[in-house]
């Protein structure tokens, strides 16, 4: 396998980076561009930006900051938020983004994945999946419009089935957002990620739960994911990226310089 990726995630709302817990009660973290610049300088392998209310507000991602990001960082970055068409995606890629990610729009129109794949290439197309474990049913269920807690909806899809479906439509990468773990820093959902890995032939990125350096080691070694996405541990300075990468190298995890 290629070297594993460390990916800071920046949730954007009203032009600022915010962070919630289990997709709720978001607090403001800071300005977008300085944070992006900082993470790039610290050695992040790539960045992901989610305009978290774009889909629920029925609008496309606020593009005013995309060009500014492209001007100040030299690592790949992915942008998500309300992208409903090839035209929407094209504008964001033209502004300098390397990838676009779709989540709720893919659930509304799965053929959009194939359209993006055919237009821009599979490497550009990321599908984000917000997965919640329902203790009553014992099943992982896909949710949508999760950026606005008042509008979040459960879908008809069980997570494993949707993972298979998006691959058939041409997804180039999957980010699995484990909602139960989001922001609580108790570790990634290894059980779910391991099960999904068995049916995921494209790069799989784990999201939700990082709290300690060992959590990154565990998710790479036990769930065999290609990358680990995290937010609060980086935003709050709990785990400096250079320190994390040094630790992973000591643990014999293949990591990028």
Curated annotation (Swiss-Prot):
The record's Gene Ontology cellular component field reads: cytoplasm
The molecular function GO annotations come to: imidazoleglycerol-phosphate synthase activity; lyase activity
Catalytic activity from the UniProt record: 5-[(5-phospho-1-deoxy-D-ribulos-1-ylimino)methylamino]-1-(5-phospho-beta-D-ribosyl)imidazole-4-carboxamide + L-glutamine = D-erythro-1-(imidazol-4-yl)glycerol 3-phosphate + 5-amino-1-(5-phospho-beta-D-ribosyl)imidazole-4-carboxamide + L-glutamate + H(+)
- This entry's Enzyme Commission designation comes to 4.3.2.10
Q: Catalytic positions?
A: 11, 130
Matching entries from Pfam families are given as: His_biosynth
Where is this chain primarily localised?
Answer: cytoplasm
Q: What SUPFAM superfamilies would the database entry show?
A: Ribulose-phoshate binding barrel (SSF51366)
Keywords carried by this UniProt record: Amino-acid biosynthesis, Cytoplasm, Histidine biosynthesis, Lyase
Q: Where in the cell is it found?
A: Cytoplasm
Which pathway does it take part in? Amino-acid biosynthesis; L-histidine biosynthesis; L-histidine from 5-phospho-alpha-D-ribose 1-diphosphate: step 5/9
Q: Which InterPro entries does UniProt cross-reference here?
A: Aldolase_TIM, His_biosynth, HisF, IGPS_HisA/HisF, RibuloseP-bd_barrel
Listed GO biological process terms: L-histidine biosynthetic process
Similarity-based family = Belongs to the HisA/HisF family.
Please describe what this protein does: IGPS catalyzes the conversion of PRFAR and glutamine to IGP, AICAR and glutamate. The HisF subunit catalyzes the cyclization activity that produces IGP and AICAR from PRFAR using the ammonia provided by the HisH subunit.
Complex and partners: Heterodimer of HisH and HisF.
Give the protein's recorded name: Imidazole glycerol phosphate synthase subunit HisF
Provide the species name: Pseudoalteromonas atlantica (strain T6c / ATCC BAA-1087)
């Amino acid at each position: 396998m290629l070297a594993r990726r460390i990916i800071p995630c920046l949730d954007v709302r009203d032009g600022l980076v915010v962070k919630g817990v289990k997709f709720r009660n978001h607090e403001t973290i800071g300005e977008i561009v300085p944070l992006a610049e900082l993470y790039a300088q610290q050695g992040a392998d790539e960045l992901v930006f989610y305009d978290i209310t774009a889909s629920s507000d029925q609008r496309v991602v606020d593009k005013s900051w995309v060009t500014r990001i492209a001007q100040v960082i030299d690592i790949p970055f992915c942008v998500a938020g309300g992208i409903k068409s090839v035209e929407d995606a094209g504008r964001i890629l033209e502004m300098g983004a390397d990838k676009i990610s779709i989540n709720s729009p893919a659930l509304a129109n799965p053929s959009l994945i194939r359209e993006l794949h055919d237009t821009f290439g599979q490497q550009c197309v990321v599908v984000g999946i917000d997965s919640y474990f329902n203790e009553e049913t014992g099943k992982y269920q896909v949710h949508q419009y999760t950026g606005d807690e008042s509008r979040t909806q459960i879908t008809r899809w069980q997570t494993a089935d949707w993972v298979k479906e998006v691959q058939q439509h041409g997804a180039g990468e999957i980010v699995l957002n484990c909602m139960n773990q989001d922001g609580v820093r108790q570790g990634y959902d290894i059980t779910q990620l391991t099960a999904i890995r068995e049916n995921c032939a494209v790069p799989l990125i784990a999201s939700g739960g990082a709290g300690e350096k060992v959590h990154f080691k565990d998710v790479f070694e036990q769930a065999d994911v290609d990358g680990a996405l995290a937010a609060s541990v980086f935003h709050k300075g709990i785990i400096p990226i250079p320190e994390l990468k040094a630790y992973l190298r000591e643990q014999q995890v293949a990591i990028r310089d």
